[in-house]
Amino acid sequence: MFDTKALQAEQRQRASEISLHDGIDNQSVRFIAGADVGFEQHGEITRAAIAILRYPSLALVEYQVARVATSLPYIPGLLSFREYPALLAAWAQLQQRPDLILVDGQGIAHPRRLGVASHFGLLVDVPTIGVAKSRLCGDFLPLHQDVGAVQPLFDNDEQLGWVWRSKIRCNPLFISPGHRVSVGSALAWVQRCMAGYRLPEPTRWADAIASNRPQFQRWLRKNPDFLGKRRDMI
């Protein structure tokens, strides 16, 4: 049995340690990571992929995949505790550490201001941004259908991030700072990482690698000697 109240209290404590001041600028960033987490075997195994891209070319230079035994059942609002062990396992394998991480999930756009992007960013002390495909909390005004349409995401008077339509005829992305990135800069960094798809390149690659999608399989056939590892800790 898990102590939900204790985990929520830990979230509030860790959220108080989050910095929303920019720890990077456009000149200092050389490598950007994308991170994605999924589950296998009916949730018994957690799988995390981290892709490292060179900036600003957005060329893939390294990837790591880790699979670990899932330590926590799904509990709404506590997903980061379920996901971060696999992320840390993949992180430990990296040869090239990034200057910025885009995480598939929430940053501070979370009821207790600690989504997986914030939690992971705090643990590794690297600037992070949450790039989520759906809203967890907050409100926003109606969003135009045009590409590039954007609205701020608010919870009462607090701006948590942005709702941004990155591609026509696609649902918007919910972008929020994770750690050591400001609300204002979070959207700009995601926009710099786009290449015509709904998702920014770092998380698009992480998703493709984690799920072994055809995009990644084709790329592997062309780059058979590329640096990449899969680590199982089960």
UniProtKB/Swiss-Prot annotation:
Site feature location: Interaction with target DNA: Y74
GO molecular function: deoxyribonuclease V activity; magnesium ion binding; RNA endonuclease activity, producing 5'-phosphomonoesters; single-stranded RNA binding
Location in the cell: Cytoplasm
Cofactors, names only: Mg(2+)
Superkingdom of source: Bacteria
Swiss-Prot/TrEMBL keywords: Cytoplasm, DNA damage, DNA repair, Endonuclease, Hydrolase, Magnesium, Metal-binding, Nuclease
TM regions (residue ranges): none
Catalytic activity of the protein: Endonucleolytic cleavage at apurinic or apyrimidinic sites to products with a 5'-phosphate
The family this protein is said to belong to: Belongs to the endonuclease V family.
HAMAP family registered for this protein in UniProt: Endonuclease_5
Record protein name field: Endonuclease V
